[in-house]
Structure formats: C-alpha cells, structure tokens
C-alpha cells in the first residue's frame, strides 16, 4: 500500500520536529525572522540549500519540557535512551497523557503492559522507560496520521508481529511455526448481510468493480484533496505478476445488492531479508467502502488473506502503510519533484513558497527537452538478462529486496500492453560502445484524482521504481562517483517523464535515493511509508532519514523494495 503525500513548504519541513513535540513543549513565542534577499530566486535557492532560519539569540535556562522536546526531536547532540528517560521524569501527568495522545500505538502498548485501559501518569511513564528511544521515534514518525489506525491494535496484539519495546538485536526469523493441517479450511463468518467472494481480474466487469471501489474509497491524503486512481491496466500489472493466484484477490459483497464493498489482494514474492530468502505474500490494495469503515472489516480481511496464503504454505507477509502499527521494519519518507508546477499549484498539491511568485517556481522546475546520457534508450526484451544481472548485483547492497526470475523481470520492467491500454512502467538502459548494459532505471505511473477540483481531474504521477549502475559496483566503493551517476540518470528520467506528460515525480528515501533527491529538486512530502513483515522478526533497517526525519545521505537506506 502506498501513501498519499504532498510537498511541504521548506519552513514547515524545517520545524517539523518541533511540531511533532507540540503536545509536550510550547513553540518559541518569538517567530523566526528571515532576512529579505535582493532577489526572490536567490532567496529560494539559499533557503532550500541551508534549510534553516535565523533565530533571535536568547540565552535562557532550558525547561524540563524543552529537554523532553530535544530528547524526542533531536538536537545538536544526539539524545540517548538515558536522556529521554531522565526527561520523562520532569513531565507533568497532563504532559505524559498528551505525549501518548500523539501515538495510539504507543498508548495501546502502554495500556497493555500496565493492564489498565486508563493507566496513571506514573504507570505510563514507567512503561515508556522500558521502551527504547528508537521505538518512541518510530511511533512519532507519521506526524499525527496515526489517529486513523489501520484496524485495531487489539487485533495486532493477537498476531505474530514484533511488539514495541522489544530488543532491537534479536535473532531474525519466523515468530510462529505452523502446519498447513492446522489452517482453517473455510473463512471466518462475516457479519449478516455480507459474503466472501473471489474476484476474477481476467474479467473486465470484475476488474472494473475493483477499480471503482479503489477509485472512490482507497488511500487519500489527510485533507481529502487527492486519492489514488489506479487504472485497470495498472491494477493488472500490480496484482497479476508471474505466480499470481485468483484466490488472493479477495472481496466482500453485500448479499442483497451484490455491491463490492471491500477488497484485499496479495501476490507471492521471494524476499531477501539480509542473508535469508523468505517466501512472502505481498499484501496490497486493502480498500473498504467508506460507509462500512465502522464494521471492523480490516482485521477480518487481513485474517482471510493470511488464511488463504497459509493454505499454500506461505507463512510470512509483507505490507506497507502510512500509519504506525506494531512494529515497522523501516520507515521511509516521500519526496516530490514538480514537473508541471503550474498544474500542481492549481490543484493545491504544491504550495507557493513565501516571498515567491508562480513564474519563479515554473522557471525553477523547468527541464530541457533532450536527455544527456549517451547510449540511453528504452529497454528491449533482448536486454532482460543483462538488466536482471545488474539488478541483483546492485541490490546486494540493500538489506531487504525482492529476488526476480526472468519472467518476473519481464513483467515488472517490460509489461505487454494491448491496444488502447495505458502504459504501466517505463524502463531505460544505457548501452556503452561495447554493447554492454551499464545502467538502467525505471518508473511507473499512478494517477491521483484531484477531489473537487474544478480545473483538473487527475494528476499524472511517476513513481521511482528500480535502478542500477555499474558505478556503484566498483571494487573500491566511490560514493561521490555514484552520486554523480545517479543524478545524471535521474535527471534524464525526469526529462522522459516530462516528455510523457507526467505532472510530478515521486520517490521514497529508500535505496540510494538520498544521493539525488536534493540535487534534482525533490521536495520533502508530508507522507511516510512504513514497511512491515508479518510473522517474521527482523532488526530495524535504515529508511534513508535520520531521527529528525531529514535525508540521511551518510547512512542511506537498507530498503531495496518498491511496492506499486
């Protein structure tokens, strides 16, 4: 599952950490003051490069609440668990309650550990001290979006998933061992008036039903301005790769009307998690009709897709979400690069920065018409073995990444489209003078509906997919050389996306993306994507952002997995 995200203004991004701690510490009453620059364009470049604002210098003794804020949001000196626990001692009972209110996941864990639905401030503080600072920060990472919990935390407590507060240096592997004979042969009963169905996505009328459900009731941003608009072509590409099973396309219909009112899907994937290869069900496209959101269908759908996977001997699951659940393997942040800034501005997707004008933004994000890399061309089927080889060698650098067969590589990088069908993915290779494939990159298309916009119906969005380059595979790793090559490749990818009338180019902070996001004028978004493994414990994997939720170019990311 992807997450809808929009760019945030630089000044908003700059103070993001402070806003996350707003229930604990009051913001500095004196507003930041920015010096006026000679030209707005210079002001924007300087602001983007430095990402900071000058504050009036004022010496004062730090309050206990300020210390807690620093322990939570980061400061000049990196906080430790001891710093955080010491700061907790200075919180008032009200502040402890406000802190827990920032994250329902943490609140639920505290309630469970204290055996109380309404633990006292002392009980809550004691429970929090048993958690690591990393767990606390993971819980706060979604920036307030956790109010919309996916399902119930009581449900997740019964499932084989890691819990908050566990040691981060545990042996990796399955949490629960089962046998197929132990799996229920029939699904759980639904509430009266609803029935299970298996959707046949090879039938036009049924994939249209799934499309319409997702188009009206799938993921949207917090302000309900944008919602994913997956076309039937994209849905087939995402849900019908080699090895797909009809039984993994699970629906719920209203018994009387036959209306499809809920859906969940899964595809098989061979996932390398550090040194182990795990066969997983990659769960995606969980959608429930808005009128049924209070019927607690989410846990029921998850249990059913789990049951069907278990019947095939698949015991692990892979999923992503924009909310914090117990317990993320990693957390990445969305970044956005405007291609058609004017349209994005008119849709309310891209803000107009302070002290700027639309024409400056259009000029800032302008791209040339022609690509620059010699030997760059679209992928052909004859290239697939070379691309597979480069993909697997490059992805050895990451901790969690899918392994692909030739058939899977063809499907994901070079899918066949019929007459009138929308193209799902664009893949390009670089062929040198010796006819060797030295680089490749790919991106896929998902449109977003601009809800209630009178001027534009959809935003055409490109999502960075997989890439690889020989520059990153030299005997002596040269990060500077890799950074330059990735910037060259992605710049050409942006030009190609412009050629195909995309409006914005999105990327997460996974893989080596932190090396090119800033230079290619990607702006930080307000969306996070958390990666989860079901029935498999894995120690945390870097997500490409630091504790302040800023790009971590030094450590990069261990996530080498992109889910449409």
From Swiss-Prot:
InterPro entries: Acyl_CoA_acyltransferase, NMT, NMT_C, NMT_CS, NMT_N. It catalyses: N-terminal glycyl-[protein] + tetradecanoyl-CoA = N-tetradecanoylglycyl-[protein] + CoA + H(+). Monomer. Its main location: cytoplasm. Residues 1-85 are annotated as: Disordered. It comes from Gibberella zeae (strain ATCC MYA-4620 / CBS 123657 / FGSC 9075 / NRRL 31084 / PH-1) (Wheat head blight fungus). Belongs to the NMT family. It comes from the Eukaryota. Gene3D superfamilies: 3.40.630.30. SUPFAM superfamilies: Acyl-CoA N-acyltransferases (Nat) (SSF55729). The lineage of its organism: Eukaryota, Fungi, Dikarya, Ascomycota, Pezizomycotina. Its EC number is 2.3.1.97. This is Glycylpeptide N-tetradecanoyltransferase. Keywords: Acyltransferase, Cytoplasm, Transferase.
């Amino acid at each position: 599952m992807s997450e809808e995200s929009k760019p945030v203004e630089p000044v908003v991004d700059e103070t993001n950490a402070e806003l996350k701690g707003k229930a604990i510490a009051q913001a500095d009453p004196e507003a930041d003051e920015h010096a006026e620059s000679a030209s707005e364009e210079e002001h924007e470049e300087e602001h983007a490069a430095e990402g900071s604002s000058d504050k009036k210098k004022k010496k004062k003794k730090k309050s206990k609440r300020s210390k807690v804020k620093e322990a939570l949001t980061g400061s000049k000196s990196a906080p430790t668990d001891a710093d955080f626990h010491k700061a907790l001692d200075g919180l008032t009972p009200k502040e402890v309650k406000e802190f827990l209110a920032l994250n329902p996941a943490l609140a639920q864990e505290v309630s469970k550990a204290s055996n109380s639905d309404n633990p006292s401030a002392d009980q809550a503080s004691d429970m929090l001290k048993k958690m690591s600072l990393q767990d606390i920060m993971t819980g706060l990472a979604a920036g307030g979006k956790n109010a919309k919990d996916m399902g119930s935390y009581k449900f997740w407590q019964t499932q084989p998933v890691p819990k908050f507060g566990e040691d981060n240096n545990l042996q990796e592997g399955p949490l629960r061992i089962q046998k197929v004979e132990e799996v229920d042969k029939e699904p759980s009963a639904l509430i009266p008036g609803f029935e299970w169905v298996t959707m046949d996505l090879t039938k036009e009328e049924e994939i249209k039903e799934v499309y319409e459900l997702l188009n009206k009731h799938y993921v949207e941003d917090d302000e309900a301005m944008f919602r994913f608009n997956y076309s039937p072509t994209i849905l087939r590409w995402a849900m019908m790769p080699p090895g797909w099973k009809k039984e993994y396309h699970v629906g719920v219909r209203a018994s009387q009307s036959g209306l499809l009112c809920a859906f969940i899907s899964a595809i098989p994937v061979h996932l390398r998690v550090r040194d182990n290869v795990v066969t997983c069900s990659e769960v995606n496209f969980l959608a429930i009709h808005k009128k049924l959101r209070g019927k607690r269908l989410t846990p029921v759908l998850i249990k059913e897709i789990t049951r069907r996977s278990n019947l095939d001997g698949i015991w692990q699951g892979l999923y992503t979400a924009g909310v914090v659940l117990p317990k993320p393997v990693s957390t990445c942040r969305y970044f956005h690069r405007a291609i058609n800034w004017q349209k994005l501005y008119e849709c309310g997707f891209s803000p107009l920065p302070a002290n700027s004008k639309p024409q400056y933004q259009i000029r800032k994000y302008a791209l040339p018409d022609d690509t620059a890399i010699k030997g760059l061309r679209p992928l052909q089927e004859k290239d697939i073995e070379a691309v597979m080889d480069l993909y697997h060698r490059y992805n050895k650098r990451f901790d969690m990444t899918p392994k692909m067969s030739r058939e899977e590589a063809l499907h994901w990088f070079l899918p066949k489209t019929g007459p009138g069908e929308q193209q799902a993915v664009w893949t390009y290779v670089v062929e040198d003078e010796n006819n060797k494939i030295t680089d490749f990159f790919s991106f896929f298309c998902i449109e977003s509906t601009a809800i209630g916009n009178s001027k534009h119906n959809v935003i055409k969005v490109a999502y960075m997919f997989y890439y690889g380059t020989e520059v990153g595979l030299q005997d002596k790793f040269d990060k500077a050389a890799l950074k330059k090559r990735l910037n060259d490749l992605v710049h050409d990818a942006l030009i190609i996306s412009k050629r195909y009338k995309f409006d914005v180019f999105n990327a997460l902070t996974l893989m080596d993306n932190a090396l090119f996001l800033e230079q290619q004028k990607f702006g930080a978004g307000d969306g996070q994507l958390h990666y989860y493994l079901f029935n498999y414990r894995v120690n945390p994997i870097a997500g490409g952002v630091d504790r302040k939720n800023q790009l971590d170019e030094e450590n990069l990311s261990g996530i080498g997995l992109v889910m449409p």
